[in-house]
């Protein structure tokens, strides 16, 4: 689920925004946030894929309620969205991009743990980190 969403974001957002090395302007950030709506529209055309829409819509919600698009908090964020949020952020940190070097797995794990309970579901972060340490999550 995560990879197709990342590819969709790349298809719908201008490269000048995706590869920008400096801070996004308010306008660019608003454009970047449209990938949630665009992804949802694309999924509606795929047979038998409606079940992933809550995860797609909610993957930028934050556990403390400060995310978007609806400002949901805690258990009100769909379960799969809470998982996707962790995977998406971990990938964003550990993947090399044209505008940044990949961060180490150790650094990414520390960031997940540091933001556990605010940005991320603390129970799911703990499980995600356990799976990394057990070698059950493949890291490319």
Label for each model-derived stretch:
Residues 10-125:
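Alpha-helical scaffolding flanking metal-ion-dependent phosphate/phosphodiester catalytic sites
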């Amino acid at each position: 689920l995560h990879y197709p969403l990342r590819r969709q974001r790349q298809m719908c957002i201008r490269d000048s925004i995706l590869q920008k090395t400096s801070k996004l302007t308010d306008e660019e950030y608003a454009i970047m946030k449209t990938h949630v709506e665009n992804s949802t529209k694309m999924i509606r055309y795929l047979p038998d894929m409606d079940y992933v829409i809550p995860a797609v819509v909610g993957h930028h919600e934050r556990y403390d309620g400060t995310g978007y698009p609806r400002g949901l908090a805690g258990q009100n964020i769909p379960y799969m969205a809470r998982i996707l949020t962790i995977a998406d952020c971990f990938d964003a940190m550990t993947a090399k991009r044209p505008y940044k070097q990949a961060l180490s797995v150790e650094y990414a794990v520390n960031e997940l743990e540091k933001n556990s309970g605010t940005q991320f579901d603390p129970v799911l972060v703990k499980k995600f980190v356990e799976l990394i340490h057990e070698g059950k999550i493949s890291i490319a």
